[in-house]
């Protein structure tokens, strides 16, 4: 009996010891998990502090760079202004030198022309007049050709400069368009990626929150069960101690009553046997009940261990997911860095465009100042109080008329010399017919030399031979029929040649001409020539007094055209600059939103990790924050 009771008492002790050991192991594991969770929490806090420090350092560097860039801009502006001032002074000096040189040249020409005019007024010989006229014409022609070549060269240079500026502007516009298209594409891709990541993160957050809620409910249920089981184990231990005490008492009683058993009467022995059987039966039932309870506790402990392993697996899965989210956030961080680099490139390009715009505005201001200075120097009152534009147009028109009428003057001078020679030879003979005048007037054109020779031959034949070609002259009755036929054939050939020359002249002039119209046009042209020469002399005197040249008109027109082109370019560049500034502002706003979103995702990730690991964090405030 004592051996059986001892063996039955040792079995519950071993089982309760194993239960206590398992509980202690579970508590040690729980403390280790909490320690690891606290370590991870401290690591996350340190990483967040490092991130904040890195952001502060980046902001400080950005401010330092912006201050340095502003200083460089100020220095560059000062240097440019100094260079432009020096260039402006050099150009002003050069312009003054050229104006003085042209004034000297014009004064010399005026003196020479005045001398020739005095000679003409004094009544010099015709040969001297023609020589002086030819010299003056040749010199004027040479000066005009030189001026024209110089102006053509300047026009070609300005065209080349304009072409280069247009090419640079087109290249700049194409590059800006390409950059804008790349930025739009990158912005759209970035926006799509952000929306996709946002949807995935929200989906994962909802799923993780649902899982966290379920895990929390499971943890609460397990804690309740653990408390119930701890109470049951405590109660079982108390029952075990009570049973041990009862067993000890029973054993002591058996030991005390075992020696006088023989001396007892038989009735008393039967009673003792009955009592011993009842005690043994009670011990067996208690042992079975304890064994059942221990088996139940073992099953509960196994269930708790299984749930603990499941929770550990879920924790590992959550850690893996947190690492995966960190890996997914790395491309976003890299994209953010790339966007920052693109923003910096855009800032540099905008700065370059601003510098170009400033240079163009400075050039425009210089051109305006130059035009205003020239206008102030060249501002004068015309003879009829005409405006400056009408004076310019009149000067251009008069220049063309002078070029056309110089040829007419040459023709008239040659015709006058020929008529003087013919008058000397003929004396009091008849005047040449109007046909010869018409032929000679148009025959001495620079482009029809054949008509000139033919008219001279026809005039000579008319003067010497007295042919019957003109009805105004009397026919010689002594001439023979053969001579008349020969002269008639010669005159018909000359007449056909003159018709061909006249047709060519009609093609050149563009209309039909007769002698009376020619005389009227000649008189009108002479009057116009004198009037234009007077106007030209007046204008040249005014220009010489002002120290300017006739090329000022063309220069001013070219400058006005270039100024208009520059204004249009400046307007286009301002529009492009405003567009780029708006795009830059949109990109900055988007970058700030992305940074805020990244921080939000980091906070959510840290909250998810804490909620998945955590026993020390309340659930409801974090849920409200999410």
Swiss-Prot record:
Modified residues (Phosphoserine): 382
Phosphothreonine modified-residue sites: 470
A GO biological process held by the record: protein transport
InterPro entries: JAKMIP, JAKMIP_C
Coiled coil (UniProt feature): 13-255, 284-413, 490-604
Main location: cytoplasm
Bias (Polar residues) ranges: 452-461
Subunit composition and interactions: Homodimer. Interacts with JAK1 and TYK2. Forms a complex with GABBR1 and KIF5B/kinesin-1.
Described purpose of this protein according to its UniProt entry: Associates with microtubules and may play a role in the microtubule-dependent transport of the GABA-B receptor. May play a role in JAK1 signaling and regulate microtubule cytoskeleton rearrangements.
This protein's name: Janus kinase and microtubule-interacting protein 1
Organism: Rattus norvegicus
Protein encoded by which gene: Jakmip1
